[in-house]
């Protein structure tokens, strides 16, 4: 038993500290990213977010979503001024559905025009204000519950809805998973430095194009991860556009010391163009 414990411990440590060699077989994309939660360097790269209280000018409000198990989910909703089937699902960073994400949701709402925006609470009400709590919540997250929340959101928006997804960091991976879950209703997927799906057979079921915002200095979603994603998408016969920036992980977060205003503006421009071309 002691030998088995040692082997498992060494395996986890190798994953946590050798991101340049991430080749975890038969491990879900969500679990791969969750390994980072226990890595001190990853925690250091994510300093506590600045205090911010969002006051919506677009009528944003928290709502409850029904799910298949009966356990309700939370979401932040901004409804279009004119009825439309265009929806954008927004996915949080590892902090949770905080006011920074609500602000990003409202920015998308304002920039895209006639669209509904739904930011999903993947932590069921838990919010982190420091890396230790964020790592704990991300490590505890179960993809089954995440998929349940997304299915609840899809049921809420209806069968005629066209669903685009976007997320950052932890939420980047969840954006990918949500687009896979949405099936034929998925029309666009944007990933900001998140863990992509690595199962080619799953990728073959994807119904939309993907825009991957990738910072080349990212030590977590690194070159090996990105190049594998490109190969996997090609093997699945799906369209992937990678926009690379000479920046570090979380460069688009204004609360991060490595925030790059110029690159963030360009990434946002590419994101809006990508969405507008597919949300018609």
Question: Language-model segments: what does each one mean?
Answer:
Residues 104, 222-232:
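Short alpha-helix in the alpha/beta-hydrolase fold that links the catalytic acid
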Residues 167-171, 175:
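Gly/Ala-rich beta-loop-alpha elbow adjacent to hydrolase catalytic centers
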């Amino acid at each position: 038993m002691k030998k088995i414990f040692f082997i498992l411990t060494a395996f986890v440590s190798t994953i946590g500290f050798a991101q340049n060699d991430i080749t975890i077989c038969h491990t879900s994309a969500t679990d791969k990213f969750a390994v980072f939660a226990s890595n001190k360097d990853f925690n250091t790269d994510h300093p506590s977010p600045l205090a911010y209280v969002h006051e919506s000018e677009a009528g944003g409000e928290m709502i409850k979503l029904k799910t298949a198990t009966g356990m309700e989910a939370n979401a932040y909703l901004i409804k279009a001024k004119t009825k439309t089937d265009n929806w954008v699902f927004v996915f949080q960073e590892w902090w949770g559905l905080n006011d920074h994400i609500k602000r990003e949701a409202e920015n998308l709402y304002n920039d895209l025009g006639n669209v509904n925006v739904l930011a999903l609470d993947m932590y069921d009400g838990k919010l982190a204000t420091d890396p230790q709590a964020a790592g704990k919540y991300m490590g505890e997250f179960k993809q089954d519950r995440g998929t349940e929340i997304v299915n609840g959101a899809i049921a809420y928006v209806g069968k005629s809805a066209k669903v685009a997804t976007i997320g950052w960091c932890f939420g980047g991976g969840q954006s990918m998973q949500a687009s896979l879950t949405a099936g034929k209703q998925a029309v666009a997927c944007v990933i900001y430095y998140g863990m992509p799906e690595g199962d080619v057979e799953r990728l073959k079921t994807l119904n939309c194009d993907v825009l991957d915002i990738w910072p080349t200095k990212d030590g977590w979603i690194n070159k090996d991860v990105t190049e594998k994603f490109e190969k996997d998408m090609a093997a699945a016969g799906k369209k992937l556009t990678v926009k690379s920036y000479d920046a570090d992980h979380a460069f688009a977060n204004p609360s991060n010391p490595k925030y790059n205003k110029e690159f963030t503006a360009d990434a946002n421009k590419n994101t809006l163009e990508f969405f507008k071309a597919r949300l018609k």
